[in-house]
Amino acid sequence: MSELTHVRADGSAHMVDVTAKAETSRTAVAEGFVRTRADVVDKLFTADLPKGDALPVARVAGIMGAKKTPEIIPLCHPLPLGKITVDFERLPDGVRIEASVKTRGVTGVEMEALTAVTTAALTVYDMIKAVDKMAVIDGVRVLAKTGGKSGDWSV
């Protein structure tokens, strides 16, 4: 089993030293879902919600979330993010959200991709809760990453 890099021998947390690492191109893709009723899906994709057109707002929120990741996840390194995309796929029971993040840096962007997805999902939830208080956010996960010492992988 590998050691946790954010925990010192005495058990205290610290920010990992990445100053000696080589700068490489890195990407991460994450997904998440907002589950809701079919009639709410229709409203979501026709911009017919009481709070307005949710998907453009959620896209911008996801992008902002990725950029703010080191401010809300305590041990994340601030990174120069070169590209962030947030996309939506209509499903019969909700919406699938996918975020892709790219950088050239010394550490990966998985947390930024996850934060983009969750921030977008929270925004969708906020904008549909007036019409569906039972909506659910689920299935948030990293789908793929490239670059860095651990190499490339995908689910």
Swiss-Prot record:
Pfam families: MoaC (PF01967). Gene3D superfamilies: Molybdopterin cofactor biosynthesis C (MoaC) domain. GO terms for biological process: Mo-molybdopterin cofactor biosynthetic process. The keyword Cell wall biogenesis/degradation does not apply. It is an enzyme of class 4 (lyase). PANTHER family: MOLYBDOPTERIN COFACTOR SYNTHESIS PROTEIN A. This is Cyclic pyranopterin monophosphate synthase. It comes from Corynebacterium efficiens (strain DSM 44549 / YS-314 / AJ 12310 / JCM 11189 / NBRC 100395). The lineage of its organism: Bacteria, Bacillati, Actinomycetota, Actinomycetes, Mycobacteriales.
